[in-house]
């Protein structure tokens, strides 16, 4: 109706009444109702567990356009659902049963990760009704600091401890190779390597 969100908007209407199709309708006086529409925040996809309970984990849609991205720390075969800001709950397509295809129908199953626990970069696209998981088994540092980073799964963060001889600037590069899982690979058929390109 073209109303402004988060402020009261007057909506005007009249009621029509008639006792039969062959009768002329009688109209009420104009009635004014103040309606305050609100904007639904569609920027977050809330990760639910297999019982559809909140987990505190979210994916982010920068443009609020139905594409949710983010890192997740998952155990092997972890099961989950995703809920949008408008309450729509997404799971795996229960009709085809194909992994990584999405559905918001009652027949949907939970999503599930492949059989490796660790760090995943998740891309869930409700418009394409498909999601993917880029498994990141390890990250290494090269440059002024060199070594292998450790993934803290419960807190979803990579760390590397080192001692600096003095205050100042250092330059390093983070490197890693990921395994992409999507509807074309299933949960155990990934044969693709993806350079993460994190610098």
Language-model-derived ranges and their functions:
Residues 1-199:
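Insoluble glucan recognition modules
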């Amino acid at each position: 109706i073209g109303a402004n969100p988060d402020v009261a908007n007057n909506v005007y209407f009249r009621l029509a009444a008639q006792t039969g199709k062959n009768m002329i309708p009688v109209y009420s006086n104009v009635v004014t109702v103040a309606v305050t529409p609100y904007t639904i925040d569609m920027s977050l996809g809330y990760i639910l567990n297999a019982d559809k309970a909140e987990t505190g984990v979210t994916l982010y849609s920068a443009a609020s356009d139905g594409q949710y991205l983010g890192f997740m720390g998952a155990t092997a075969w972890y099961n989950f659902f995703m809920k949008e800001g408008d309450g729509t709950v997404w799971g795996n397509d229960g009709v085809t049963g194909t992994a990584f295809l999405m559905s918001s129908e009652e027949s949907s199953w939970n999503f599930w990760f492949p059989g490796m626990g660790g760090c995943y970069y998740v891309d869930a696209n409700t418009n394409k009704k498909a999601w993917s998981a880029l498994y990141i088994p390890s990250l290494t540092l090269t440059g002024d600091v060199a070594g292998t980073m450790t993934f803290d799964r419960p807190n979803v963060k990579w760390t590397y401890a080192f001692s600096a001889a003095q205050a100042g600037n250092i330059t390093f590069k983070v490197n890693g190779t990921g395994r992409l899982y999507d509807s074309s690979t299933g949960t155990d058929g990934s044969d693709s390597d993806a350079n993460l390109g994190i610098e």
